[in-house]
Amino acid sequence: MGVPAGMPHPNGLQPQRKDKALAQNPNTPQKGSEAFLKKLIHSSWFFPGAAIVVMLGFLMASFFTQPSRQVDTNVGLQLLNDHQVKSAKIYDGDQRVELQLKDDYKKGNDNYGKSVRFYYVQPRGDEVAKAMESAELESYTDQPVEHSFLGSLVSLLLPILLFGVLFWFLMGRVGGGSSVMSFSKSRAKKFTKDKPEVRFSDVAGVDEALAELEEVREFLAEPEKFTRLGAKIPKGVLLYGPPGTGKTLLAKAVAGEAGVPFYSISGSDFVEMFVGVGASRVRDLFKEAKSDPAAIVFVDEIDAVGRRRGVGMGGGNDEREQTLNQLLVEMDGFDGNSNVIVIAATNRPDVLDPALLRPGRFDRQIGVDAPDMQGREHILRVHAAGKPIANTVDLAQVAKRTPGFTGADLANVMNEAALLTARDNGNVIDDRAIDEAIDRVMAGPQRSSRIMNEHERKVTAYHEGGHALVAAALRNSAPVTKITILPRGRALGYTMVMPQDDKYSTTRHELLDQMAYAMGGRAAEEIVFHDPSTGASNDIQKATDTARKMVTDYGMSAVIGSVKLGGEDTEPFLGGGGASARNYSDATAAKVDAEIRALLEQAHDEAFQILLENRDILDRLAFALLEKETLLENEIAEIFKDVRKRPEREHWYSKPTRERTDIPPVKAPSELAKEAEKSEEAPAEAPTVPVAPAAPAQQVPVAPTQPLPPQAPLTDPDADPTVAMPTQQYPNYPAPPEHRPENGTPNQNGAENERG
C-alpha cells in the first residue's frame, strides 16, 4: 500500500533517500564547493598563497589600528601651549609625542579626533619639554620604545616568506610545476598494456632490429622457453643509427607489444642545474620499475647522459658523470637481480662510455640503418594506408626513386603528397603529387617567386646540362633521372643521378666518375660562355671532399699509398665531434694537397673533353631545358641516345711496380645458374674448329681530338647563337693527364648536383 503524497513515510526512509540523492548530485552547489576547496588545497600554490594572505592581513591590521593621527610639529606645540591637551606621552628613541586632547581637533572640514601625534627632531627636544611643563597636563609620561610582537613578527617572517616563495617558484619551474620536493623524482612516463599506440605491424624496413626486439618481448612473455636452456634475459638493448631511421618508433612498438609496464624518458631529463638531481632521478626510476614484476625502461637520446667520462672541464665532479655512474650501477651493479630491461636509442654511439656498452649492461647493440629498396616499399605501404592513392601510383617505383631515404623521409613524402593534393582540391594522390613531394623533401619547395632573366636561365640550363651529359658519357655513373632549371630551395636548378639498385660501397672508378660529372657544370660554363659563374661552388666543394677522402681515407693515391692520414676526432668538451688532428708532417701535407689538386684537374679536364666531343647534344639538351624547364628520365634518354661515351678506365694498381694480372674473378653461383639456363634454352651448335691465336696487335698512336664538324642549326638562325647556331669550332684540347687516383665522396644512394 502506498503512502499519500506529502505525508512522511512511517519508517522515515523517504527523507533519508532525498538527502542522500541531494548529497550525491554532482550538480549541487555543495558538491561543487567541496571539489573546488579540495582542488584549491591540493594546489601547489595554496600554502605560499595562504602565507602571503596572512602576512598581508597582519600588515593591514597594524596599519588600520593606528591609535592616532599625525599632525605637524608646530600644530602639536601650539596645542600644548593653548592648554588643549589632557595628557601626553613621549616615546624616547622614536622622538614621537602622543597627545590626548580635551576636544576634537579640526582642521577645516577634517576632524582629527581627540588622539593626535607629532614628531620632532633632536634640536627641538628642549622646546617640546618646556611646552609639556607649561601645558598643565593631567598626566605626563616618558616611555621607551617597545616594539610590538606583531611588528617584530612581521619584520622577521616577511624576508623568510619572500625567500620561501622564491624557492618554491624555482623548484616548481625545475620540477615541471609540481610540488617542491618532487624535482628529484623521475620524469619517466609510464605506459601499460591498456594503452597501446604502435604495434610491430606498424614498423617496416628494419627487419633485423624488429626480430631482436620481438625476442625481447618473448623473453618477458615466456621466460621459461629460454631459462630452461640456461639463457639469461639481456639487461639492455642499444638502438643506434642515423636520425629518422625508426629507433624511437621501434621503442613505441615494444611499448605496445610488451605486455609489461613501459617507462619512457629522455636522457636530458636526468640532468638538472642542481647537484645530485640526476643520480636521484635514476634511482627513483629504477626503484619504481623494479617494483613491477617485469618492466622495460626506454631512454631516448642516451648520449645526453652517457657520454664518455673524463672528458671536458668538469672531471669527476661533473653532474652528468654522477648521473652516468648511478645508471651504470642500476643496470649492472652489486644488486644483480633485476627484472628491468633497458632499451636506449642514440645516433652517436661513438661518444658513449665504454662501461655503458659492455656486455651485462647493453648486451645487444642493434644498428638501425636507412632501409633498402624492399624496406622502403614496405614503409611507403604503411604510410599509404588510409590515404586515397591513385591506381596509377606504383609504390615500388617510388621506392626505387628514393634511395637513401629514411623512414621519416618516406613518411614526409607521403604526407607532403597528401598536402599537395589537398591544396589543389584533389580527391586522390597521384604520381604528380608524389613526384613533387619527393622533390620538396630532397631540395626544398619550389621558388616560384624567384624570377631569373633569360641569360641566367641559359647559364643554368647549360650548367645542369653539363652535369647530366658528363654523367651519361661515363661508364661507371648511375643513370640521369631528372634535370630541372626551376629554382628550388637554395638551388637554381639540379640534376638527379640515381642508381638502379641500392649500393653499400663505392669503387675507385665510380668515385672518379662522380668527380668528373660534379665538374661538368663548371666545364660547360667555360666552354659556352667563357665566363664561369659562382653556381659551381657547391660542386667544387663536393668534388674536393671526395678527392680528399680518396687520398687520406681510402688509400686510392699511388703517391701517398694505402695510408690513413689524420687522427680520429678529438674530444675537447663534448666527448667527440672536435676538429680532426693532423698526425703527419708538413711535407706529407704538401703531397696530399698536390694529389687533391691533380685529381680535381683530371676530373675537370675529363668533363671538358666529354662536353667538347658532345657539344651538339649539350646544345640540344640546353634548348629542351629552356623550353620545358624540367626533363624526366624518358626524355633525357631520348636526347642522350647518341652520346659519345668515354672508354673504360684502365686497371689501377696502388703501386706501379706490382705484377699485373688479368685473371678474372670467379663466377658467382647465381651467374653459373643463369648461364646453365641459357645453354639449355639455346639450340645445339655445330662444333667449331680451333683457330690459331692471332699475333699481338701493334699499338697505333691515337691522333689528338679533332673539332666536331659544323652541324645544322637546331632552330632558325635568328635565335640565340649559343643554342640555335651550328656548333662552333674550338681549338684542340689535350687529352687528360696521366691517370691518377681521384676521389668523390661515396654517394651510395644517388647523387644530386645543384647550381645555387
From Swiss-Prot:
Catalytic site positions: E464
SMART domains per record: AAA
GO cellular component terms, A-Z: plasma membrane
Gene Ontology BP terms: protein catabolic process; proteolysis
PANTHER family xref list: ATP-DEPENDENT ZINC METALLOPROTEASE YME1L1, METALLOPROTEASE M41 FTSH
Any one GO molecular-function label of the UniProt entry: metalloendopeptidase activity
Role, per record: Acts as a processive, ATP-dependent zinc metallopeptidase for both cytoplasmic and membrane proteins. Plays a role in the quality control of integral membrane proteins.
Gene (UniProt): ftsH
Spans within the Cytoplasmic topological domain: 1-44, 170-756
InterPro entries in the record: AAA+_ATPase, AAA_lid_3, ATPase_AAA_core, ATPase_AAA_CS, FtsH, P-loop_NTPase, Pept_M41_FtsH_extracell, Peptidase_M41
Subunit structure: Homohexamer.
UniProt keyword terms in alphabetical order: ATP-binding, Cell membrane, Hydrolase, Membrane, Metal-binding, Metalloprotease, Nucleotide-binding, Protease, Transmembrane, Transmembrane helix, Zinc
Compositional bias per record (Low complexity), positions renumbered to this chain: 684-703, 713-724
Cofactor note: Binds 1 zinc ion per subunit.
Taxonomic superkingdom: Bacteria
Family membership: In the central section; belongs to the AAA ATPase family. In the C-terminal section; belongs to the peptidase M41 family.
Subcellular location: Cell membrane
Transmembrane residue ranges: 45-65, 149-169
Species assigned in the record: Rothia mucilaginosa (strain DY-18)
Protein name as annotated: ATP-dependent zinc metalloprotease FtsH
Its EC number(s): 3.4.24.-
Chain residues that bind ATP: G241, P242, P243, G244, T245, G246, K247, T248
